A protein has these predicted regions:
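N-terminal export signals
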Residues: 4-6, 11-33
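Dinucleotide-binding Rossmann-like beta1-alpha1 core, especially the glycine-rich loop
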Residues: 89-166
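Helical element adjacent to the flavin cofactor pocket in flavoenzyme catalytic cores
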Residues: 236-275, 284
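C-terminal segments that line or cap access tunnels to active or ligand-binding sites in enzymes
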Residues: 344-457
Length: 532
């Protein structure tokens, strides 16, 4: 069995950058591939998992006439792109800000014919950052304004700030504008970490904190994240500003689910995949669910976790040893701790949407990554009613207090949690939540503790329960190794999600399209060269 090759690091970065530009995609190519498969109903596809990657894959295949069965163990589609109701409040599970309009998500959703069914709101600022040493608000869709504000607070690092953001803008010009320079900034940054790149220009750790503030979105420290990747991803935010799918992220998930069903695809909720079935020729023939019902398939796209796929759903000895080794070398990403608050009044005194609060005097050492006592970690505050009018019912406010979290502090509660013995676990999560509220009340929202009408707390174990992701991971595997190809060494098995392509709304949507396209290429090849 031939192993699907991994991309070398340099090729991986180049492929990632090409994929981030809609202009690099052959948008007509998908339809041409579909036309090459005349008897589409003879090529059924099963997708495991209705996260955004699975939804996009299923939407593409159903739109072009293929028989699609999407299996989802939960009651709703979307994975983390969903919401839940408590009293008068509807809380978004995951979305704070993304880039959709004028970027890859708009291109994908337009290609599927559903972009016009969605609306986005723009964040009023890029970010506000509050620390013991400074309080700064970075403006949205205004790279020069960001630089000017950093100049104001850190005049001693003026030249370094200018040079850092100039280099970021050059990357964007090379990537999106197709411009060429005597020295390629993409080539310069490709071998560097974010920490190394920043250190070429500035020394003040507070300035580095501001420059690297978005690294938490990718679940890695500046010493681990690739400089070029960060320049591209953060450059999108600088230029386009943070955006939000109205009225909640589940509107995006529902639009994709509606697209699937409108094109005669099936979504089976409360249906957990059990194992992938192979025929007597060792070809994939379907997926058996936990109720022992087999759903026929010529190809399977996995939007579930890779550990579950290869350890629980695949027969043993199906994977080449080298591929197994590549998987085993990967590290599960961080999870999250979130406090969802519904307030009984409007917050007229605070107008910011996203606020980072860190009260450690050496803020750069942690940069919103978890501390030994999670209660003292940096907090990301999102006040959703400052995003658009009518987010909450009149006179009330919806907000979240969130930090990244390792799984290790929660592991000791795991067995009791899944056996519904949660007293000790509940005390710990409430201790952390109360400390978060106390800190935010003192620094940002006076009187917060007296406004709370509804409070829900999500931990890594909560994430694990609802998504079945190992350790409650929110980004799949860490980005410290190159992404996996959609096509696996097992013929007919494809990957589409955070575990293969990296976490975040945009990467998993791109993964969904890539996986569906890879399936069609294999179908076309099998027609041209039938099995003997």
């Amino acid at each position: 069995m031939k192993q699907t090759p991994y991309l070398p690091r340099r090729n991986f970065i180049k492929t990632l950058l090409m994929a981030s530009s809609a202009a690099a995609i052959d948008w007509a190519g998908f339809g041409k591939l579909a036309e090459a498969v005349p008897n589409k109903k003879d090529f059924p596809v099963v997708i495991i998992g209705a996260g955004l990657g699975g939804l996009v894959s299923a939407a593409y295949l159903a739109r072009y006439g293929f028989s699609v069965t999407l299996m989802e163990q939960h009651a709703v589609a979307g994975g983390y792109a969903t919401s839940f109701d408590r009293g008068d409040f509807t809380f978004d599970v995951s979305l704070h800000a993304t880039v959709a309009e004028h970027a890859m998500p708009q291109a994908i959703l337009s290609d599927l014919g559903i972009w016009d069914n969605l609306k986005v709101a723009y964040a009023p600022e890029l970010r506000r950052i509050i620390t013991p040493g400074f309080d700064i608000t970075l403006p949205a869709k205004n790279p020069k304004g960001v630089i000017t504000e950093l100049f104001r607070v850190f005049p001693h690092e003026k030249q370094g700030i200018h040079d850092f953001y100039s280099e970021m803008e050059q990357v964007i010009s090379e990537l999106w504008g197709g411009k060429r320079f005597d020295i390629s900034m993409m080539a310069k940054l490709e071998p560097l970490t974010l920490e190394q790149w920043m250190s070429l220009h500035v020394k003040d750790p507070d300035v580095k904190y501001c420059m690297a503030v978005f690294s938490g979105y990718y679940g890695l420290s500046p010493a681990e994240i690739n400089a070029l990747f960060y320049a591209v991803a953060t450059g999108e935010y600088l230029v386009h500003g943070g955006q939000y799918y109205k009225t909640r992220s589940r509107d995006l998930s529902n639009a994709l689910a509606d697209c699937i069903e409108a094109n005669h695809g099936k979504i089976l909720y409360h249906t957990e995949a059990g194992r992938i079935v192979f025929d007597h020729n060792n070809q994939i023939s379907g997926v058996m669910d936990k109720n022992k019902i087999t759903h026929p398939a010529k190809a399977v796209i996995a939007n579930c976790s890779i550990p579950a796929l290869f350890n629980k759903m695949m027969p043993k000895n199906r994977l080449p040893p080298e591929f197994e080794k590549k998987i085993s070398q990967r590290r599960v990403s961080l999870s999250s701790f979130a406090v969802f608050l519904g307030l009984n009044k409007a917050l007229d005194q605070v107008h910011d949407y996203e606020i980072d609060l860190d009260q450690d005097k050496e803020v750069y050492k942690n940069l919103l990554l978890p501390k030994a006592d999670l209660a003292e970690s940096g907090i990301s505050i999102t006040i959703y009613d400052n995003l658009f009018k009518g987010y909450s019912v009149p006179g009330k406010t919806t907000l979240t207090l969130m930090c990244l979290s390792n799984f290790e502090p929660w592991k000791k509660y795991e067995a009791d949690y899944f056996n519904n013995r949660k007293d000790v676990y509940n005390r710990e999560k409430e201790r952390i939540a109360r400390r978060f509220i106390e800190r935010v009340e003192k620094a940002v929202i006076p009187g917060l503790s007296h406004m709370i009408e509804v409070m829900e707390i999500g931990t890594p174990l909560t994430n694990m329960f609802y998504t079945k992701n190992p350790q409650g991971a929110i980004y799949g595997f860490d980005r410290n190794l190159p992404q996996l190809n959609s096509k696996t060494p097992v013929k007919g098995l494809y990957l589409a999600g955070a575990w293969s392509h990296g976490g975040g709304y945009t990467p998993v949507m791109m993964a969904g399209r890539e996986a569906a396209e890879s399936v069609l290429k294999e179908f076309k090849h099998s027609i041209a060269q039938p099995e003997t």
